[in-house]
Amino acid sequence: MSKLTIVRGFNDVLPLDSYKWQLLESKVKLILDRYNYSETRLPIVERSELFHRSVGESSDIVSKETYDFQDRNGDSLTLRPEGTAGCVRMVIENNLATRGQTQKLWYCGPMFRYERPQKGRYRQFYQLGVEAYGFDGIAIDLEVIAIAWSLFKELGIYEYVTLELNSLGSSLNRQEYTQALLQYLKPYHAELDEDSIKRLDKNPLRILDSKIEKTQKILANAPKLIDFIDHDLRLRFKQTCQYLDALGVRYKLNENLVRGLDYYTGLVFEWTTDKLGSQSAICAGGRYDGLVENLGGQKTAAIGFAIGMERLLLLLEDLGKLPNQDNACDVFFILDSAQLHQSLAIVENIRQELPQLKIDMDLKFGSFKSQFKKADKSGAKVAIIIGQDELDNGFAGIKFLQQNEEQQQVAFNELINFLER
């Protein structure tokens, strides 16, 4: 029988690593509470049509990266490749963005894409999503960017990341620009890289995002998207940059920054780092003011971003920003297996009264000698002995495992006071 192994592109989070996730998640919640965003929890499976209509039929994600299947009713379902489409579906279905309502939401969970696994890019990956609905003005653009900015400062990595900004204009602006770009690229068709040639028919704007040096040289003299954007949207983008200057948020303009999802309009942004090789983007987002309406809801302004949690953890590890985990318990109990009905009751009472303490014991209840060996390995400061003699006399034995002090006795009714010291 063959050995069962984990599916390629998927990862186990081992006990020694889970504390890193808990630390990061606690920082995330701290920042989002500060901005008064509410958590929502979304299903990992949605109808395939949702992603076809939102992410886009021609996008790389829908065309070749989704995990699709049919259920027993013959319905086409998809493991979510990103979170925004499902969040918008929830907002529409539960009437959360009607009659001028506003929503500030966040979620964190696994997403799935069939990509070539590499460092920082997995087939199951965790993503933090932050979304705001019903806000038209620049203030929400600044707030959403400030959330990521605050998180990176809280984590101590702000100096290692760069905010890149661009504006995609309106849908009509992009259509006009796309035609101009295609016209410009006609003479260079044979010189473009393979992926860019495919994108000519499906999503020409994605050619701007090509990492191929030869393609970038061809694009150097191409028409600029900013020249096709309406005056009011250009002014809004300029004002956004001015407000970021006032806040002290560093950024750079990237006229080739386009998002791989079809629903983005207006402002788009990425936070990137040069510490993770090719997987440089750790956060990406922008406005998608037409998406709610496109999926059957009322016309609703919307903006959001996503952070790849694995990439963020990799960056924190590479920069030495994660503290070592302290697996040591505080107290280790040495118990007589013949008297467990009494001694376990004492242990559980202490756990209830002092929930801040990490308490452990040898649940195999071997000899006292073997239990003491495990107590020494546990890292506990104190071992508490409850054997037959201790139960008969009403006193627990106290052995200090990290200090050269004599063993003491403490009455059972004083144990909690002793441990609180």
From Swiss-Prot:
One of its GO terms (cellular component) is cytoplasm. Its EC number is 6.1.1.21. PROSITE patterns: AA_TRNA_LIGASE_II. Keywords: Aminoacyl-tRNA synthetase, ATP-binding, Cytoplasm, Ligase, Nucleotide-binding, Protein biosynthesis. GO terms for molecular function: ATP binding; histidine-tRNA ligase activity. It catalyses: tRNA(His) + L-histidine + ATP = L-histidyl-tRNA(His) + AMP + diphosphate + H(+). Homodimer. Belongs to the class-II aminoacyl-tRNA synthetase family. NCBIfam families: hisS. This is Histidine--tRNA ligase. It comes from Francisella tularensis subsp. tularensis (strain SCHU S4 / Schu 4).
